[in-house]
Amino acid sequence: MFSIQQPLLVFSDLDGTLLDSHSYDWQPAAPWLSRLREANVPVILCSSKTSAEMLYLQKTLGLQGLPLIAENGAVIQLAEQWQDIDGFPRIISGISHGEISQVLNTLREKEHFKFTTFDDVDDATIAEWTGLSRSQAALTQLHEASVTLIWRDSDERMAQFTARLNELGLQFMQGARFWHVLDASAGKDQAANWIIATYQQLSGKRPTTLGLGDGPNDAPLLEVMDYAVIVKGLNREGGHLHDEDPAHVWRTQREGPEGWREGLDHFFSAR
């Protein structure tokens, strides 16, 4: 068992978890965000989104200054007080966005895979795809270590594409709405472990960890947490963990921020 009073880190996915998949509403989670902030419990956002997008969301959610995990773990935005850490303000894993883009353009040109990346379109098109404002959509294009795309080919071709990327040291990952290409060495789990180790080094004690996510791409993150909340997903398969001991893993009945709140209620309110 654990409590909100002990050293604790909360790691949370965004779309479909803390944010509603369509409206991006987070208000159902607001009371718990306030309570965690008052208790000095860091809420560390983890997403496929760019660091620029997530810094904007951090401010909106009242979480500014905390570390975050962007681009599925390929980018770690460091906490404001970690200025002495090499790489401040961000640590980037693997090859850059530009290098990945070159690989994808070559595969598309020579092997005729069909897909559209966020680099292929303008912010107005992304706003139409996502429901974001144009200014927010522009932030989605500021990738540093990954590429976001829409797959427009067959499942058979996708398998071939994935294999080619793997040969080149890259991975192909499904998100809530889009697909993402990033370095094979990057991941939300590795990034989370690095952040946990940093907090442990600074405080002298390993914090207890709670993670929340809704999709298969969140499973690696949840696997390295002490406690996990699998938020009910909308029209997609939820994550599956190797060990779903009910004492440590809770599957919600509600979706999005309602499920996020349900998960916090389950692990804290009953204790």
From Swiss-Prot:
Cofactors demanded by this protein: Mg(2+)
Record flagged with keyword Magnesium: yes
Source taxon at top rank: Bacteria
Protein location: Cytoplasm
Pfam families (alphabetical): Hydrolase_3
Gene Ontology terms describing biological process: mannosylglycerate biosynthetic process
Its EC number(s): 3.1.3.70
GO molecular function: magnesium ion binding; mannosyl-3-phosphoglycerate phosphatase activity
Gene3D superfamilies to which the protein is assigned, alphabetical: HAD superfamily/HAD-like, Putative mannosyl-3-phosphoglycerate phosphatase, domain 2
UniProt binding sites for Mg(2+): D13, D15, D214
Major subcellular site: cytoplasm
Keyword Cytoplasm on entry: yes
InterPro entries per UniProt: HAD-like_sf (IPR036412), HAD-SF-IIB-MPGP (IPR006381), HAD-SF_hydro_IIB (IPR006379), HAD_sf (IPR023214), MPG_Pase (IPR012815)
Known catalytic reactions: 2-O-(alpha-D-mannosyl)-3-phosphoglycerate + H2O = (2R)-2-O-(alpha-D-mannosyl)-glycerate + phosphate
Keywords from the named record: Cytoplasm, Hydrolase, Magnesium, Metal-binding
Recorded family membership: Belongs to the HAD-like hydrolase superfamily. MPGP family.
Xref: HAMAP family: MPGP_rel
Name of the protein: Mannosyl-3-phosphoglycerate phosphatase
Protein species of origin: Escherichia coli O81 (strain ED1a)
